[in-house]
């Protein structure tokens, strides 16, 4: 092997290691899905309400802020949408949705909770509202999508607030990340105690385990 070829291979290996590191640190979508033993039209919004009641709403933007009704499939246009100013209580939002109950409908609600968010590169953080989406699927919606995605599913958005892998892990960063994770864990624990869900799953779009990613993140500086 010539020196030039060896140098090219070394550069290529370095390039792919860099790519792998970037891919590994990419933010991932985070979800919490629940399945129930009974989830017909008469029960599904009641089950969703039991989850919403445990949610730690943002102090500055409390309540349900948005509701949309999707018929049959995500490809179909919504047949009803409403924004709430100020935010509605879970009971009020569910009451709006309860007028149209069908097994092939999906009911989407949005709310916000407060998570620690970096404001500057100098280490300033603030509690800022972050959107969480509640998705309630009828059993026949999107050809039975609820079987794999959840009858009630929470979309937390990207897992960035619970890892912040883009930041150097100082004591300050670690304390804020841990506070956000504790908010998530406390909410899930309350749901597990109060709901009658038969199956519950916290999962990510990539299939990676959030707890393992967090442990790995913390261990890199120990």
Spans of model-derived segments:
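Short glycine-rich, low-complexity/disordered patches
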Residues: 3, 22, 57-78, 110-113, ...
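Cationic, low-complexity basic patches in intrinsically disordered or flexible, solvent-exposed regions
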Residues: 8-9
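Short, extreme N-terminal segment that most often corresponds to the first beta-strand
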Residues: 15-76
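Short, hydrophobic beta-strand segments
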Residues: 30-36, 82, 98-101, 152-164, ...
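Short, intrinsically disordered low-complexity segments
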Residues: 55-136
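Acidic, proline/glycine-rich low-complexity IDRs
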Residues: 147-222
């Amino acid at each position: 092997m010539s020196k030039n070829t060896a140098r090219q291979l070394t550069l290529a290996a370095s390039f792919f290691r860099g790519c792998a590191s970037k891919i590994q640190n990419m933010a991932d979508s985070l979800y919490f899905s629940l399945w129930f033993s009974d989830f017909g039209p008469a029960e599904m919004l009641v089950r969703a309400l039991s989850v919403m009641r445990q949610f730690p709403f943002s102090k500055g933007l409390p309540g349900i802020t948005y509701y949309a009704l999707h018929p049959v499939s995500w490809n179909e246009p919504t047949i009803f949408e409403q924004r709430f100013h100020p935010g509605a209580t879970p009971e009020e939002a569910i009451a709006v949705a309860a007028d149209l109950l069908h097994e092939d409908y999906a009911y989407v609600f949005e709310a916000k909770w407060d998570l620690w968010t970096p404001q500057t590169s100098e280490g300033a953080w603030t509690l800022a509202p972050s959107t969480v989406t509640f998705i309630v699927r009828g059993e026949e919606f999107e050809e039975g999508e609820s079987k794999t995605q959840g009858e009630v599913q929470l979309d937390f958005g990207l897992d960035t607030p619970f890892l912040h892998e883009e930041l150097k892990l100082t004591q300050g960063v670690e304390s804020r990340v841990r506070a956000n994770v504790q908010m998530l864990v406390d909410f899930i624990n309350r749901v597990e105690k109060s709901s009658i869900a038969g199956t519950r799953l916290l999962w990510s779009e990539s299939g990676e385990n959030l707890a393992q990613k967090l442990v790995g993140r913390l261990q890199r500086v120990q």
